[in-house]
C-alpha cells in the first residue's frame, strides 16, 4: 500500500477505485485490482 500526499489523482486511475474515510485516514480501495490501494493521513 502506498502512502501519498495527493489521492485525487489516484482515484481517477481505475474506474473501480473508491475513496473511504476511516478514523480521519483516507484510503483508496479497489476490489478488482488491489494494486491501486493507497492511504493518506
Curated annotation (Swiss-Prot):
One of its GO terms (molecular function) is structural constituent of ribosome. Keywords: Ribonucleoprotein, Ribosomal protein. SUPFAM superfamilies: Ribosomal protein L36 (SSF57840). It comes from the Bacteria. InterPro entries: Ribosomal_bL36 (IPR000473), Ribosomal_bL36_sp (IPR035977), Ribosomal_L36_bact (IPR047621). GO terms for cellular component: ribonucleoprotein complex; ribosome. One of its GO terms (biological process) is translation. It holds the Pfam family Ribosomal_L36. HAMAP family: Ribosomal_bL36. Belongs to the bacterial ribosomal protein bL36 family. This is Large ribosomal subunit protein bL36. It comes from Caulobacter vibrioides (strain NA1000 / CB15N) (Caulobacter crescentus). The lineage of its organism: Bacteria, Pseudomonadati, Pseudomonadota, Alphaproteobacteria, Caulobacterales. The gene is rpmJ.
